[in-house]
């Protein structure tokens, strides 16, 4: 599961650094206690705990607390919540696609003007309010051909849809 690009991206964002992914892999492999995970991954115990709590805060891991009858210390048994990872990815992908489609619609429906010095990009209505003069430097605004930007957004949409489709095929299999 961790090899999927969407899963890896989500988990890397949560654990802050790709070098902490072995902690997640240990959880997936069924290692339960923070001490055992630290031992298996050779990552400091305080870092393991920090990452486990981050996963917990995102709902990607849960724990059960039990008391050792001999030492009277609490032991935390952790479990990776695969379904929550799936839910996060579905939700994040849908949200990102909505944002991209909204951005695409805006770019396709709007005429833009830019400052030749790179100070500002304004839609037609706002540019008319400034008489097509840059409010920062006084240069005359130029028409901005956003064809390449529209193409890039469409490519991004295709990529997200393709990655999401590939992910759901793996999950549903």
UniProtKB/Swiss-Prot annotation:
Q: Does the keyword Transcription apply?
A: yes
GO molecular function term, any single one: DNA binding
Keywords of this entry: DNA-binding, Transcription, Transcription regulation
Q: Which residues form the signal peptide?
A: none
| Pfam families recorded | TFIIE_alpha
A single Gene Ontology biological process assigned to it is:
regulation of DNA-templated transcription
- What is the superkingdom listed in this entry's lineage? Archaea
NCBIfam families attached here?
PRK06266.1, transcription factor E
Describe the function of this protein.
Transcription factor that plays a role in the activation of archaeal genes transcribed by RNA polymerase. Facilitates transcription initiation by enhancing TATA-box recognition by TATA-box-binding protein (Tbp), and transcription factor B (Tfb) and RNA polymerase recruitment. Not absolutely required for transcription in vitro, but particularly important in cases where Tbp or Tfb function is not optimal. It dynamically alters the nucleic acid-binding properties of RNA polymerases by stabilizing the initiation complex and destabilizing elongation complexes.
Instruction: Note what the entry says on domains.
Output: The winged helix domain is involved in binding to DNA in the preinitiation complex.
The entry describes its oligomerization and partners as: Monomer. Interaction with RNA polymerase subunits RpoF and RpoE is necessary for Tfe stimulatory transcription activity. Able to interact with Tbp and RNA polymerase in the absence of DNA promoter. Interacts both with the preinitiation and elongation complexes.
PANTHER family, sorted: GENERAL TRANSCRIPTION FACTOR IIE SUBUNIT 1, TRANSCRIPTION INITIATION FACTOR IIE, ALPHA SUBUNIT
What protein name applies here? Transcription factor E
Q: What is the lineage of its organism?
A: Archaea, Methanobacteriati, Methanobacteriota, Methanomada group, Methanobacteria
Q: Which gene encodes it?
A: tfe
């Amino acid at each position: 599961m961790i090899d999927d690009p969407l899963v890896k991206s989500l988990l890397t964002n949560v654990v802050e650094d790709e070098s902490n992914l072995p902690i997640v892999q240990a959880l997936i492999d069924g290692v339960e206690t923070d001490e055992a995970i630290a031992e298996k991954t050779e990552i400091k115990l305080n870092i393991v705990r920090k990452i486990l709590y981050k996963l917990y805060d995102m709902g990607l891991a849960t724990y059960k607390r039990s008391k050792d009858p001999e030492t009277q210390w609490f032991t935390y048994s952790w479990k990776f919540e695969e379904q929550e990872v799936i839910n996060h990815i579905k939700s994040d992908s849908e949200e990102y696609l909505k944002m991209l489609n909204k951005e695409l619609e805006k770019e396709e429906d709007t005429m833009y003007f830019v400052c030749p010095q790179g100070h500002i990009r304004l839609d037609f209505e706002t540019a008319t309010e400034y008489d097509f003069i840059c409010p920062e430097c006084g240069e005359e605004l130029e028409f901005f051909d956003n064809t390449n930007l529209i193409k890039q957004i469409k490519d991004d949409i295709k990529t997200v849809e393709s990655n999401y489709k590939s992910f759901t095929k793996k999950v549903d299999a």
